[in-house]
């Protein structure tokens, strides 16, 4: 899939995760996102187990520390053979560059280097929070754009941002720079704790490279049907 749909496996127990995954068809090569909760509970072994079954893994740990620590951590993550992983863009260019170096150095010979994605502003962040709690003088769109340019200069492969911010800035970046967007909700689904959301089709039209979808699939009465409907909306213009 050239423009992946990552299913967010936001569970607190791996038995629940496997129960969900076993409800899906065509699991070989399926793109999934594994976050902090599962990784911190089960460690690298859960990544190896998913990888052994053919899943393409987005390991979302949002690293944010001094450059040397991030580099050494990225070196370890690269050995797991994940598709991509994340750092916080707010960690600065030196930290992002260190993460990239760690991934390159830690990737086994003959294997692809995991893609490095920089998280800009979380999709739970509103204009009010940015101004009143983070004390940022820029509006959200400009802040995200600034962090995106910083990430590109630091040789990240792409960014994580809201689907609402992609359209206005995509033309300023190279074609291979990735815009991975969570905050994806079908029209019939409530926003829950996400402040900046779009439908899969809207994200595609705005220029998203990949989308991340969790609860609308994992909590659906029929996960396979929900996945297929979201994938259809996300992929509807592929033939054009």
From Swiss-Prot:
Pfam families the record matches: OMPdecase
EC nos: 4.1.1.23
Gene3D superfamilies recorded: Aldolase class I
Keywords from the UniProt entry: Decarboxylase, Lyase, Pyrimidine biosynthesis
Transmembrane region(s): none
Summary of subunit composition and partner proteins: Homodimer.
Record protein name field: Orotidine 5'-phosphate decarboxylase
Lineage, uppermost ranks: Bacteria, Bacillati, Bacillota, Bacilli, Lactobacillales
